[in-house]
Amino acid sequence: MIKKTRTLLLSFLLITISFITLTGCDQTASSKEKDATDKIIRIGFQKFGTLNILKAEGTLEKVLEPKGYKVKWTEFPGGPQLLEALNVGSLDLGHTGEAPPIFAQAAGAPIVYFANEPTNPKGEAILVPKDSPIQSVKDLKGKKIALNKGSNVHYLLVQALEEYGIQYEEIEPVFLAPADARAAFEQGSVDAWVIWDPFFAEAEAKTGARILVDGTGLVQNREFFLASKSFAEKHSELLDIVYKEIEKAERKTIENKAEVAAFLSPQLGIEAETLEKVLERRTFGIEKITKKTIEEQQKIADKFYELQLIPKKIDTSEALLKVDS
């Protein structure tokens, strides 16, 4: 009986030790897996923009490698989709136009601005088919207009309609991502298309689309760089590195626009001549967010709330990481 008891006790001890060992291994493996995940910077980008140039050159990876970081790039059809991924924790940072952060903040997304590009009003426009009878924004009354909901061009449409005395309710917005909007535009399913570069320039080149009006005098059309609040608070030094690498990429682009266009062409599937046109009418010069810029964002937010495009009033300064005077 004593021998049997000792045997059972020994078996119990062996099982307990094995369990503790395996649990320790699992915890170590989980810890290593978490460390590996923490060392990956997840960046969202769109079809064209400064981050797209940075990705193509691969310089950010080279700078971060000695620090033990890797970069994971994910492409999105537009800013709203990118910020949704940022909201649910699938990304650490990315870039959008001026309107998407407004919609994201109104939805409670934990995002912060950390930098922006200069204004670029010529980089977006309301287009109509080359043989369309529509000659003015006034003619858009009662028409179907394709646009990516919540994107920078959403604000362009709002401003253009107001400028020409048309109520937002007097047009029929058709919310489509760029690729689907292009198809609808070519098939005649919509009367006009509000779109940004490079889709804008490509539509001009490939379909002969006519510019009804661009953003000049109507919108600022800035490109913003945003991060999840938690990432920004924990990794300000990484945001500084990204900022500096964007600066370098922009200097190279300004000095060699034709070369950069040729380099990006096969990667984007867009002709170099079209990309060069985009680069020529675009402004460069990343800068820290200022109070003035945030105040301009507030005006957009107030307008969207007035039109009931967002469910509540927001304070854009609450999404500010840092303000330079």
Listing of model-derived features with the role each one plays in the protein:
Residues 99-100, 170-265:
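Pocket-lining segment of extracytoplasmic ligand-binding domains
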Residues 1-40, 325:
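Short, low-complexity disordered leader/linker segments with a strong preference
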Residues 33-36, 129-144, 233-237:
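Flexible hinge/capping segments at coil-to-helix
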Residues 34-49, 69-75, 142-146, 172-174:
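Short, well-ordered beta-strand elements
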Residues 54-69, 154-173, 204-207, 262:
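Ligand-binding cleft/hinge of the Venus flytrap
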Residues 233-309:
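Secondary-structure end/capping motifs
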Residues 52-54, 77-113, 122-130, 134-135, ...:
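Pocket-flanking alpha-helical
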Residues 40, 47-75, 80-81, 85, ...:
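Short, polar/charged alpha-helical segment
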